[in-house]
């Protein structure tokens, strides 16, 4: 049992996950963040030599990544994690902050995403089972996800809800195709005794990509949006609004006005978006413009990362093109030859 390898892997991943969650609050260059980065680097420095020394008994045999399909599929899963987790999780927030939708309306947009994912997984599974080919499905899947995120980068406050739903459905179809087929070349390339390890490594790459995407893309979005909002709140036109009797006399505006006048306008607490419910449209306009710009900047790099994954899928090899190592092939002259053909499975 590779206890030391498991401990080193935890020492590598856990500090990075903590920074991914808290980095925007602490600051990426804060002492706490830098200390955790250093701790994660130390964990990686211990993990690699330990795993190399353990060989096939390692918790993550690094020799697996010498097989092109396993390394490539892990890289593609990483790009999917970055692009999807870093953007899909923000769609409800986009609908609330930019389009003024209610939390219920914003949450319902996840339904077409799930429907597209489930339907495309079922279809792609049947196609692979009947033909044994997956490369075209992977290309279409990654291309669809990249196209959907780039399309999201063009949306704004006036985009109709049906347009958002179509893009989200398109995104769901793409991820359903990709998730189903991306494991096929990896499983075909891995030794039978290490299929579970290969699957786990690929899934881990996707989770790391998701954490990275959430941390980086969220930080980019908030930095752009709140920086722009701070500038807009200090324009002479907006400062006049803060003293307009029609604005100050409306109780619905009071919480927002208190925040703006205290100099915290760029620090809107997005854990409680009720602050923005019912406020005057003139007060809301800078918030909408700022976050629309921030979301555009976030969706664009997410789409670019998925385009990189799309390019990688062109290098996947079909099942028929993969050949297992000689020692992994079943012996044709062994038990099977002596005892006759194995009975067909009822499955």
UniProtKB/Swiss-Prot annotation:
A GO CC annotation given for this chain: plasma membrane
Membrane protein topology class: Multi-pass membrane protein
Disordered: region residues: 321-347
Stored Pfam families: MFS_1 (PF07690)
Parts of the chain that traverse the membrane: 3-20, 30-52, 73-95, 108-130, 137-156, 161-183, 204-226, 294-316
Subcellular location: Cell membrane
The UniProt record lists the keyword Membrane: yes
Keywords: Antibiotic resistance, Antiport, Cell membrane, Hydrogen ion transport, Ion transport, Membrane, Plasmid, Transmembrane, Transmembrane helix, Transport
A single GO BP: proton transmembrane transport
Disulfide bond entries: none
InterPro entries: MFS (IPR011701), MFS_trans_sf (IPR036259)
GO molecular function, one term: antiporter activity
Recorded family membership: Belongs to the major facilitator superfamily. TCR/Tet family.
Role noted for this protein: Resistance to tetracycline by an active tetracycline efflux. This is an energy-dependent process that decreases the accumulation of the antibiotic in whole cells. This protein functions as a metal-tetracycline/H(+) antiporter.
Name used for this protein in its record: Tetracycline resistance determinant
Native source species: Streptomyces rimosus
Gene that this sequence comes from: tetB
